[in-house]
Amino acid sequence: MLNSWPLAKDLQVLVEIVHSGSFSAAAATLGQTPAFVTKRIQILENTLATTLLNRSARGVALTESGQRCYEHALEILTQYQRLVDDVTQIKTRPEGMIRIGCSFGFGRSHIAPAITELMRNYPELQVHFELFDRQIDLVQDNIDLDIRINDEIPDYYIAHLLTKNKRILCAAPEYLQKYPQPQSLQELSRHDCLVTKERDMTHGIWELGNGQEKKSVKVSGHLSSNSGEIVLQWALEGKGIMLRSEWDVLPFLESGKLVQVLPEYAQSANIWAVYREPLYRSMKLRVCVEFLAAWCQQRLGKPDEGYQVM
């Protein structure tokens, strides 16, 4: 049992150091001196009885304990800000511009309707919604919040899981009547595969797991596109086998217009909100992330706890 609890201001100092990359830059952000920042980190490390940061000529790096502390600090500070927002006598409302990015298919089918509902709840917000067919850089593309269907998030961003998702192999019954259904990943090379080049997907390489191992298989076919919506239409027309997100194909699987191929295999493709600044700093960012998380989980359902994609 600790003799005292870490102070919120010390957790904030740690977060600022991680995001700015140095003690001096964190001090400037906080409006304090480097000596103040150093002292608060020393107090935090003494309180927790562990080393949180390693300093060298190349910069500052989190220790294993520091990484865990940083992750908890983000959550604690966000909860603390939520407490202040909820109980303060002067109710504040999120306002101003927020720029949101997403891929075309998921953006049109899910995020655009979500933004419509978001604006009903928070009319003081201004939203610029931009769709991309490539992986974006939040700074260069001037995006505050990016919705990504991809588990590989760079360390210099913060990511909040909106909901679980996986990509699965599907084909129309018409196609599977013409060609024997593959019994292994290797047999995919003998099939017409509908290849998609969207944002995070490597063209012609499908990485699939069965809960025990992950394999990469090279695929090809007569048709390919950078539009998942076009590839889905081709699959429905019986043109080949595709790899698509579960949220995109579930209605067609239920209606029998598509059949799952090699159902023991899938590709992890969870849906994330990706941003640069901690949520406790920005009410409008926090409101958007929390709203989109609730929206996605309500409409896409809870994840299948019994399935694990390697």
From Swiss-Prot:
GO process annotations (BP): DNA-templated transcription; positive regulation of DNA-templated transcription
Q: Would I find Zinc among this entry's keywords? A: no
Looking at the record, the residues that make up the HTH lysR-type domain are 6-63
The gene is ttdR
Supply the source organism for this entry. Escherichia coli (strain K12)
Which is one GO molecular function term here?
sequence-specific DNA binding
What is the name listed in the Swiss-Prot or TrEMBL entry for this protein? Answer: HTH-type transcriptional activator TtdR
Similarity comment text for this entry: Belongs to the LysR transcriptional regulatory family.
Q: Which InterPro entries match?
A: LysR_subst-bd (IPR005119), Tscrpt_reg_HTH_LysR (IPR000847), WH-like_DNA-bd_sf (IPR036388), WH_DNA-bd_sf (IPR036390)
Q: Any idea which UniProt keywords this protein has?
A: Activator, DNA-binding, Transcription, Transcription regulation
